[in-house]
Regions:
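Terminal amphipathic alpha-helical/low-complexity segments used for targeting or macromolecular assembly
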Residues: 1-49
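A detector of tandem-repeat and repeat-rich interaction/domain scaffolds
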Residues: 47-119
Length: 119
């Protein structure tokens, strides 16, 4: 069962890629059906399993994936081939990119950047 859908609302990121606002279809975690989330490029960026969610003005693009119970919010960005999973939280103006992985109970926030092959 799908937990979210892409809406027709979109923004265009600095590299010209269209990112679509997401909308919750069911209740899970702290998310209620009908809640609007952040922006993703494609459905594959956010898992339909677990409580993972992207909210506020957060952006997920490229081949990046958010799954498990991970949360990305605020103005955070996850892109490239990066993964955010487990109970990890990425928020504020933080960026995760490249082949980086943020997982477990890790928190990346403020203006922090995790990139390259970091994990």
């Amino acid at each position: 069962m799908k937990k979210f859908k892409l809406t027709s609302e979109f923004i265009v990121d600095i590299s010209g890629v269209k990112l679509f606002r997401i909308k919750a279809l069911i209740e899970f975690g702290n998310v209620k059906a009908g809640d609007l989330g952040g922006y993703i490029e494609k459905e594959e960026n956010l898992s339909h399993m677990g409580d993972a969610w992207v909210s506020d003005d957060a952006r997920i693009s490229g081949n990046a994936q958010v799954f498990g119970n991970a949360q990305v919010f605020g103005n955070a960005q996850v892109f490239g081939d990066a993964w955010v999973f487990g109970n990890a939280r990425v928020f504020g103006n933080a960026r995760v990119s490249g082949d980086a992985q943020v997982f477990g109970d890790a928190q990346v926030f403020g203006d922090a950047q995790v990139f390259g092959d970091a994990w």
